[in-house]
Amino acid sequence: MRIHVVLGNDETGERIYLTSKNRRNTPDRLELKKYSPKLRKVVTFKEIK
C-alpha cells in the first residue's frame, strides 16, 4: 500500500515536496536529495511525520 509523505528540509524549514512510498518496502523514514530554492542547491529532504 502506497502512502503520501511530505518531505521537509531541517535547515530552512521548507516543506515543498510531496511524494509517495510503499510502507512495506521502506519502513524507515524516507530521505531524498532535492533542490532547495532558498539555498539554491541540492540538499537532503527528510520525511515528516
From Swiss-Prot:
Know the name of this protein? Large ribosomal subunit protein bL33
List keywords of the entry alphabetically.
Ribonucleoprotein, Ribosomal protein
Q: Which family does it belong to?
A: Belongs to the bacterial ribosomal protein bL33 family.
Superkingdom of the source species? Bacteria
Q: Does the keyword Ribosomal protein apply?
A: yes
Any one GO MF annotation of this record: structural constituent of ribosome
Q: Source organism lineage? A: Bacteria, Bacillati, Bacillota, Bacilli, Lactobacillales
Q: Which NCBIfam families does the record match to this protein?
A: PRK00504.1, PRK00595.1, rpmG_bact
**One BP annotation, GO:** translation
Quote the InterPro entries the UniProt record gives. Ribosomal_bL33, Ribosomal_bL33_CS, Ribosomal_bL33_sf, Ribosomal_zn-bd
Q: Name one GO cellular component term.
A: cytoplasm
Mind telling me which PANTHER family this protein's record contains? 50S RIBOSOMAL PROTEIN L33, CHLOROPLASTIC, LARGE RIBOSOMAL SUBUNIT PROTEIN BL33C
